[in-house]
């Protein structure tokens, strides 16, 4: 059902996670795989003012890739047809089974980025410059392992 994933999941310790069925984000690589698309999150959003991947809650009928591609389209204007999905990795888990899946994809058809109200900016950031940004805490934790995976994909 469309939009049925919106809502918080709460762990026994009180920690909250967005997405009743988990969440997913898109790590989009530029065509030459030297840059990653980052979203500067709107101030009103959870962890607003930080940089992260476009993404959000999974709906009950969606795979992680479906959710990441849908959210990326909503937040950046990049249609799924402009991207080639390369891999998926679970980058966060909760005690009650909630997961955040990062979907790695390569841009295959350049498109103009069109931010929605959830973004104050969208930028293609060089891989080595990602840590220079004020990152969403969960993305900052996941980035070192994601960067290793990105570099491995680029060397294939």
Walk through the language-model features, giving the residues of each.
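Acidic, metal-coordinating catalytic segment for phosphate/diphosphate chemistry
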Residues: 1-27
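Conserved Nudix-box catalytic region and its N-terminal flanking loop in Nudix hydrolases
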Residues: 32-75
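A short coil-to-beta-strand element that immediately follows conserved catalytic motifs
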Residues: 79-89
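Charged phosphate-binding loop/patch that engages nucleotide di/tri-phosphates or the phosphate backbone
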Residues: 138-156
